[in-house]
Every structure is written in structure tokens, then in C-alpha cells.
Amino acid sequence: MQTSLVRAEESRDLSASREQLWSFLAEPYHLSDWWPGIASVQPDRRGLAPGARWSLVGGGEPTLFRKAHATNMLIVREVQPLERVSFHLLAQRLDVEIMLRALDADRTRVTVAVAGRWRPEALGRPRALPRHALARLHALVQTAASL
């Protein structure tokens, strides 16, 4: 079965400082709040550090090829505090990169990129991951900013 190496990237400006966003993103347990398809996270003792391995439990309904609440593993690849973090999702064979760029004191541009090999018929879903993740992150950040 033929696969293609594909990279999908989306950016969004959020009403929060880079420090506030980093504080939220650096907490492993928050990943399930904004990353699509993750119901819970069990980080190892290292937390957000290169080489750390987090156990993930997916949410959602079962499909022909996926059980409900399937497990996955995340491996943290690189951490540059306040700037970027990258990780690998083993089950999906996805490399994920999240980058933060301060626009001013209270606004930050967040870029989410995913790369991996997918069969052509599956390209729609992986390409949409950055957009869905940013939409969920935006909803969380904007709600917190308005409190």
C-alpha cells in the first residue's frame, strides 16, 4: 500500500502572552484538553523533557480500524522553553511541532505542524489535525482571557 510523506501546518494568533501559553502547554495533563482524539495523559516522571514518554488514551467512538479508548505513546523529542516543543505519536506515526512567537505582550502566534506518512485516502484527517488543535487551544485560551 503506497503512502505519502505529508506535512500540514496551521498558525493562529491567540490573546495570551507567550509565557501563559507555554505554562499551559508545558503541563502534560492539559494535552487532552486541546489535542484531538486524546482523552487522558499519563506522563512519565520527567514531564515535558526530551526523551520523556507519555501514555495516552484516545477518546471517541470505535471505528472499523480503531477501538474506542485505544492507547498510544507520545515521545517528547525537543523542548525549547517559551519557543517550541516537538513530539512523536507512535500509533499514528506522526511528528508534531508546536511553535510560539510573541506578537506583543498579550498576543502570541501559535503554529502547529504535523508530518507523517499516510495513505492517500487518509490524507484529509491528518491534514486537519493542526487546525482542530488550534481551534480547541483558542477556545481554552480565549475563555481564560475573558475571566
Regions found by a protein language model. Name each.
Residues 1-49:
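Hydrophobic ligand-binding cavity/cleft-lining segments
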Residues 1-13, 103, 107, 131, ...:
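Hydrophobic-ligand-binding modules of eukaryotic lipid transfer/binding families
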Residues 11, 75, 97-99:
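Short, surface-exposed charged micro-motifs
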Residues 14, 60, 114-116:
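Hydrophobic beta-strand positions in extracellular immunoglobulin-like domains
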Residues 18-19, 46-49, 77-82, 99-109:
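A short, structured loop/turn motif at beta-sheet edges
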Residues 20-25, 31, 56, 76, ...:
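Hydrophobic pocket/interface hotspot
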Residues 42-95, 132, 140-147:
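Glycine-rich portal/gate segments that line the openings of hydrophobic small-molecule binding cavities
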Residues 84-143:
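Beta-strand/loop substructures that line and gate deep hydrophobic ligand-binding cavities in soluble
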